[in-house]
Amino acid sequence: MNRRRKILLALATSLIPLALTAHAQPKIWRVGFLHVGNHHEPPSYRPLMAGMRELGYEEGRNIQYDFRNAVDDADALEIARILVQSRVDVIVAFDNEAIAAAQKGTRTLPIVMINASNPIAAGYAQSLARPGGNMTGFAGRAELPAKELEFLREIAPKLNRILLLFDAREPASTAWRAEARIGAKKFKFTLIERDVTNADGITRVFDNLKPGAAEALMFASPGLRHRHMELGFTLALAHRLLVVANRKDLVEQGALFAYSYDFAKVGRLAASRYVDRVLKGRPPRELPIEEVTEYELTLNAGALKRVGLTLPQAVRVRADKVIE
């Protein structure tokens, strides 16, 4: 063997361990999480990561998570831009504000939606069956406000005046207000509608609210409700208003009721039905948006007692959980 062939053979042999090492290193997937509202962690977040672990994704070994909590819409847009520039493989966006920011940040990077409200009306997808773009995921019931008013009538038959807060800037707000008006007409409620965009606006509404002008509080904008439910809840209780909440934990704290789904279950399902499939190459446009249909009614009988009302027995037996 001549000198040149010996050198080439030695070089090739020395490269084999490097090739084997490179082959042994698994790809590290990068998942960005976007949430608006620093008052709480989205309840689907940790269950989603638990679902990913069940599928074989181990943080630090083959997957990396980047959770970003935005203060407001403007902050969400900046964070969405940062996530796109950091070249994550998929963005998981919780609730409409985060979803809208992610959509504005990219039209190509896959986006998995959690708790989308009226995704068609909001312009996130062409249809539930065929999203048609770079977004898919789980959506809540489109007719939720009307259903909430139906429950409110059954729970408090003598109730009449509802303070309805909405943010006209939100794309889904139009559909939610329409549903609320349909429900109010059907179940004979008077809606006191107020257009607000932030915490100061909500505070001013309550500062100007005359005693007895309203008996209950509802939100007709998903983003506004997500951002400022706690503030509305606190102010409503101070004014002796019943509160229609969006989470069970608020019912435990004194809200009248929440008609909501199991956010933890949805988070875990999102791992297998969406995030894992996207990472394995399925484009979002081929994955139908799933509308959550399993809702639970959580009631607080004590909230009624505080305003001199009693929970009807017919409603009590229908509720999934009653807090005394």
Describe each region flagged by the PLM.
Residues M1-E324:
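Short hydrophobic alpha-helices and adjacent helix-cap/hinge residues
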